[in-house]
Every structure is written in structure tokens, then in C-alpha cells.
Amino acid sequence: MKKDIHPKYEETTVTCACGNVINTRSTVKDIKVEICSQCHPFFTGKQKLVDTAGRIDRFKKRYNIKD
């Protein structure tokens, strides 16, 4: 490898919106994510309601879809 052309590979903290913190290595100092393996519905087995109610209502209104 050539010297001084590659970014530094450092300890990194990945922080999830649920509060889970993961330490890993990356060229990025701090990473913030919205969903991790501790809160993702696939891994937890729980259904998590994402803020889509407004989008669904707007879609139905736009295309005149009745329930």
C-alpha cells in the first residue's frame, strides 16, 4: 500500500435510535442509524408501526380509493 493516501481505519461507535450502541471499526468516526438488530421487526418478531398512516391516507385520497 502507498503511504498517506488511505483514510484512517479507527474505532467507531454505531448508535441506533433505540439506544443500542455497537462498537466496530470504520473510516467514519460516528454512525447513527434508525434501525438495528435489537429493534428490527425481523429479529425481534414484533411488528413495529412506522409512520406511514399519513402517506397511506394521502395515497388513497389522491387515487379516490375507498376502504
From Swiss-Prot:
Family annotation (InterPro entries): Ribosomal_bL28/bL31-like_sf, Ribosomal_bL31, Ribosomal_bL31_A, Ribosomal_bL31_sf
Annotated keywords: Metal-binding, Ribonucleoprotein, Ribosomal protein, RNA-binding, rRNA-binding, Zinc
UniProt-recorded Gene Ontology molecular function terms: metal ion binding; rRNA binding; structural constituent of ribosome
The keyword Ligase is annotated on this UniProt entry: no
Gene Ontology annotations of biological process type: translation
Residues binding Zn(2+), per UniProt: C16, C18, C36, C39
Disulfide bonding pattern of the chain: none
Superkingdom, taxonomy of origin: Bacteria
Cofactor comment: Binds 1 zinc ion per subunit.
Alphabetical list of SUPFAM superfamilies matching this protein: L28p-like
GO CC terms: ribonucleoprotein complex; ribosome
Required cofactor names: Zn(2+)
Function: Binds the 23S rRNA.
Assembly notes: Part of the 50S ribosomal subunit.
Family designation: Belongs to the bacterial ribosomal protein bL31 family. Type A subfamily.
The protein's name in its UniProt record: Large ribosomal subunit protein bL31
Gene: rpmE
